[in-house]
Curated annotation (Swiss-Prot):
It comes from Edwardsiella ictaluri (strain 93-146). The active site is at residue 143. GO terms for cellular component: tRNA methyltransferase complex. PROSITE patterns: SAM_MT_TRMB. The keyword Protein biosynthesis does not apply. It is an enzyme of class 2 (transferase). This is tRNA (guanine-N(7)-)-methyltransferase. The gene is trmB. S-adenosyl-L-methionine binds at residues 68, 93, 120, 143.
Length: 238
């Protein structure tokens, strides 16, 4: 696998430092995760390149495409791929242990409608995802960066909302979920002011958790800690 970020330099050759929504940490791979990377990455892994993907070629068919950003260990992503064989799923995660775990689960489940990447999702969106190509984008339980001085690291910002809109088809949906109330409020504020979207909530706030979203590890952890859960769904309308 390539590095999770691409080095960028200005005209004077100085490295450009982007504000990123994640901290780079490799983590230790279990034997099973390493085996999955060795065995199944060639089948389901997608390397980062600065060229747009041909999604029908990638999956070998024309089908609705769901992009999930930050799939963690991949359990819910694999479950959705199992439940919806009529859709194709592309998952992005920056931490290789999670990618290995997802590949292992996908192989055990026998799914063939799932591909994964190990790279910065913002770079993937900028370089590899064609405009108006996605039926849904999922962002479940991203890092809330709860300290005020770190709020600039939150992935849901105005520019990000605009980038997602450009990649969604008309009527495509951006589905977010968080167990951090302040982040939910931040997401709602950003998205309600983002042009070209319609909030699918009846009262212009949050939607009930749809049955289509499996309960994630982070959601269960939040429930044990007494946290609530907030789902937001916004449709691209223009």
């Amino acid at each position: 696998m390539n590095d999770v970020i691409t080095a960028e330099f200005d005209e004077n050759g100085r490295a450009i430092r982007r504000i990123r929504s994640f901290v780079r940490r490799q983590g230790r791979l279990t034997k099973g995760q390493q085996l999955a990377l060795d065995e199944y990455w060639p089948l389901m892994g997608v390397e980062f390149t600065p060229e747009a993907l041909d999604l029908p070629t990638l999956f070998g068919r024309e089908a609705p495409v769901v992009l999930e950003i930050g799939f963690g260990m991949g359990a819910s992503l694999v479950a959705m791929a199992q439940q919806h064989p009529e859709r194709d799923f592309l998952g992005i995660e920056v931490h290789s242990p999670g990618v290995g775990a997802c590949l292992s689960s996908a192989h055990e489940a026998g799914v063939n409608n799932l591909r994964v990447m190990c790279h910065d999702a913002v770079e993937v969106l900028e370089r590899m995802i064609p405009d108006a190509s996605l039926d849904m984008v999922q962002l479940f339980f991203p890092d809330p960066w709860h300290k005020a001085r770190h709020h600039k690291r939150r992935i849901v910002q105005s520019a990000f909302a605009g980038r997602i809109r450009g990649k969604l088809k008309i009527s495509g949906v951006f589905h977010m979920a968080t167990d951090w109330e302040n982040y939910a409020e931040h997401m709602l504020e950003v998205m309600n002011h983002a042009p070209g979207y319609r909030n699918l909530s009846d009262d212009n706030t949050y939607v009930p958790r749809p049955d289509s979203r499996p309960v994630t590890k982070f959601e269960l952890r939040g429930q044990r800690l007494g946290h609530g859960n907030w789902d937001l769904m916004f449709e691209r309308v223009e």
